[in-house]
Design a protein with these regions (language model features):
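Anaerobic metallocofactor- and corrinoid-dependent redox/one-carbon enzyme cores
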Residues: 1-407
Length: 407
């Protein structure tokens, strides 16, 4: 199939970054401004031959606009936002909502019950900084671990942790959930994220075998050229649309967002000569893929713009856990040269809080030391131990063998 075929590249998301204020009477107009631009963008996307999978709205920190007097007042505000989102959802495209970052331990403590109640309309993150000595804020980490464990225990099969992550060295304008957040001093903006595993797999099929260095150079060139073509097509589409002016275009996240419904990222490793993802050589391929995503020109690259290894969202990675092709240490190693950290990793329900906190600190230390955005999104599975298989029912998740966190 020709790499220019639009079926090989989908628009995973158009994500709108929006500031909300305490005055709830302004919320309807704010969300309507998103709808207005969606109504302008959707026909342009379709005319260009692409498929748009989701619209996402990402706000400033929820403590700046939700009434956090108590859990009930916060839920009431989220209920109102849910009603507004449902009111404006006329396109039939999936709408997802992120309430931004929790800024302190008190706000983190509210998240389990809010996520349990509102799920995919209540995605949230925590941004953990370094202190003056270059050490991660362990109080925020420990409260985040409590939230992860609480979410696991009060949502079916622990699936609520799909909507919560801990960020390290992550900047605004990540279009993906739940790591995306907005800051109120930044302009309202939108970002486009792509789903391209099918594209990358297809182009690699036609790269002829040659000696290692030449083969890897050819693989890089083929993937970079194909990805740049579709980015240029998206930019051409945007240039032809006259939007409302309420949102600035902030850029594209060039990551190959994974999905149950497209090629596995592991197929790329196999096409590049590895027996499986996790075998010796996986770091080298991961680094080359990251180079591909960073090669995109003529547009600001925002978000992760790197290799996403989301374990429970990728059928090949999920299968790899069951075959014991890799472990948590391997995922952390690959994060040194690529994207996202420990993302959607299922672990034992009885994993120690101290061990989860320690693996978060390891990931965060790597993020700041190597100056890259990394996240930790773990799924403790109640009543299961490492080595057992998850029993997820969510349409977004693949079942995996639970990985062990080294004590």
């Amino acid at each position: 199939m020709d790499y220019k075929n639009k079926e090989l590249c989908r628009l995973r998301t158009i994500s709108f970054f929006l500031t909300l204020h305490k005055d709830k009477t302004q919320w309807e107009d704010a969300l309507y401004s998103v709808k207005r631009d969606v109504d302008l963008l959707l026909p342009a996307v379709q005319k260009a031959g692409y498929t748009l999978q989701s619209i996402r709205v990402i706000t400033n920190p929820f403590g700046e606009y939700l009434d956090l007097t108590n859990l009930q007042t916060a839920k009431a505000d989220l209920q109102y936002l849910t009603e507004l989102l449902n009111k404006f959802n006329e396109s039939g495209i999936r709408i997802r909502f992120a309430i931004g970052a929790a800024r302190n331990t008190e706000e983190i403590a509210l998240l389990p019950e809010l996520i349990a109640a509102y799920g995919d309309l209540c995605n949230a993150c925590v941004n953990v900084p370094l202190d003056e000595n270059g050490v991660l804020d362990n109080e925020l980490i420990e409260q985040s671990v409590y939230a992860v464990q609480r979410i696991a225990n009060i949502t079916p099969r622990g699936e609520g942790n799909f909507n919560f992550t801990v960020n390290f060295n992550c900047k605004p304008f990540i279009p993906y959930f739940p790591a995306g957040y907005h800051l109120s001093h930044l302009p309202n903006s939108f970002v486009i994220g792509l789903e391209t595993p099918d594209l990358l797999v297809e182009v690699l099929k036609s790269v002829p075998k040659s000696p290692h260095n030449q083969f890897y150079a050819d693989c890089y060139q083929a993937m970079s050229q194909a990805l740049q073509y579709h980015v240029d097509q998206v930019l051409e589409m945007l240039s032809a649309v006259k939007l409302s002016g309420k949102f600035e275009f902030a850029g594209i996240d060039s990551s190959a967002a994974p999905s149950k419904n497209c090629s596995s990222i592991t197929k790329i490793y196999e096409l590049m000569g590895l027996p499986y993802f996790g075998a010796a050589g996986s770091v080298e391929v991961s680094a080359l893929l990251t180079k591909v995503f960073k090669s995109i020109q003529r547009v600001p690259l925002v978000g992760f713009s790197g290799l996403m290894l989301a374990v429970t969202e990728d059928l090949g990675l999920a299968e790899g856990t069951q075959k014991q092709y890799f472990d948590i240490r391997a995922l952390l190693t690959y994060s040194a040269v690529c994207g996202i950290g420990l993302d959607t990793v299922p672990v034992a329900g009885n994993a120690k809080a101290e061990s989860i906190a320690a693996i978060m600190r390891d990931t965060g230390t790597m993020a700041f030391r190597l100056n890259k955005p990394l996240t930790v999104r773990l799924f403790p599975i109640p009543n299961k131990v490492a080595g057992e298989i998850s029993e997820f029912e969510s349409d977004d998740l693949c079942n995996c063998r639970l990985l062990h966190i080294p004590d």
